[in-house]
Each structure stands twice: as structure tokens, then as C-alpha cells.
Amino acid sequence: MALKTTLPAMHDVELAALAAGGRRDAFGELVRRHGSAVRGLLRRMGAEAATADDLAQDAFLAAFEQITDFRGDGTFQAWVKRIAARLYVRHWRKAAHVDLLAETPEPEGVHHDGDEGEAHMAALRIDLDEALKSLAEHERLCVSLCYGGGLSHAEAAEALNTPLGTVKSHVKRGLDKLRRRMAPPEGGDGVERRVHG
């Protein structure tokens, strides 16, 4: 049992190797570390909260079943995000291209606790969410994976089973649309900060 206390200090590659050897607690640590990031990616891709939770769970189950395929060439988080992205695309296609954004719940209200900077950032995030919803599905997926999910263009292309050049085009068009939509009326900061903010 002494090894359990060292799991949080271990690198993802070490945890994956332990998980491949049957250590469920090691895989549990990977889920604890990366679960929120995977759910967040799925939400940015357009999944409702409950769907994002279900798809994240499915992604980690698939990752557990395929853990011997993880070689550590990239990060574990990028690997499991690619799995999650593929599951989301499959889910989206099965839904016969139903507009998943139509039923998206309204964002939670901005809490004003006296910190104007925090309130401003919350408002920017809401604006960004609305701007992302205005993109075509393929643009939103590519922008969400590359900027919100931290995947490279090549990793996003693999996750979406789409040619690399197409992903790059979708990202460029999506960012151009976001810049136009989010540009302050009289100039100011650009969308790049807001996308990463």
C-alpha cells in the first residue's frame, strides 16, 4: 500500500505502464489528473454537460482498454483527448447532425464579488462561448481541439480522421470569424488572448 502514496508524484508514462500491468489505481490517478481537461474539451466541442461526462467516461474506458498502445511519444492527456474527440465526432454523426447547440444550457451568471478583473474574464469567456457557437461545426471542432484542447494540427487531423490541410483551413477560417465577431468596436485586444484565456 505504500506505493499508493507515490502515485501522485509519478509521471504519466509510469502510471500508464503500471496500468498496463493491471494496476487500476494507477489508471485512476490518470483519470483524476486529466478528467477535467477531457470533459472541458468535450464541452468546448459542443457536448452538453451530461453528454460530455458520458463521453469522457467512455474515452477513459477506451483508453484503459488500449493502454498498451500508449507509448509515451506524446502526452497522455493529448492521447486521451484524441480518443475523446473521435468519440464525440462519432456521437455527433450518430445524432444525424442534430444541432447539439440548440439545447445548450445558458451560461451561469457572472458572480460579482468585487473583483472586476475576474468578472471581466468571466464575461469574455461567455462571449467566446457564444462566438464559438456561431462557427460551422467543422470549424468549431478544429478550433476547440487545437486551441481549447491543446492538440497540434496533426493530432486534431488524426482525431477527426481529416486531412491535415483541411484542419489547418478550418482553424484559420474559424479564428478569422472569431476575430471579426469578438473584435471590440474601437480596437483593443485580439481573440488569441481570449481563446487561450
Regions found by a protein language model. Name each.
Residues 2-6, 47, 140, 158-161, ...:
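C-terminal edge and immediately downstream basic/flexible tail or linker adjoining helix-turn-helix-like DNA-binding
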Residues 3, 20-29, 39-58:
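Short, charged helix-capping/linker segments at alpha-helix termini
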Residues 8-9, 90, 97-128, 195:
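Internal acidic/polar
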Residues 14-18, 127-136:
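Short amphipathic alpha-helical boundary/capping segments
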Residues 20-21, 46-47, 57-75, 94-96, ...:
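Sigma70-family region 2
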Residues 31-49, 66, 132, 177, ...:
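Amphipathic, Lys/Arg- and hydrophobic-enriched alpha-helical face
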Residues 68-72, 82-103, 121, 179:
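Arg/Lys-rich amphipathic alpha helix in sigma70-family domain 2
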Residues 130-141, 145, 149-166, 177:
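Helix-turn-helix DNA-binding module
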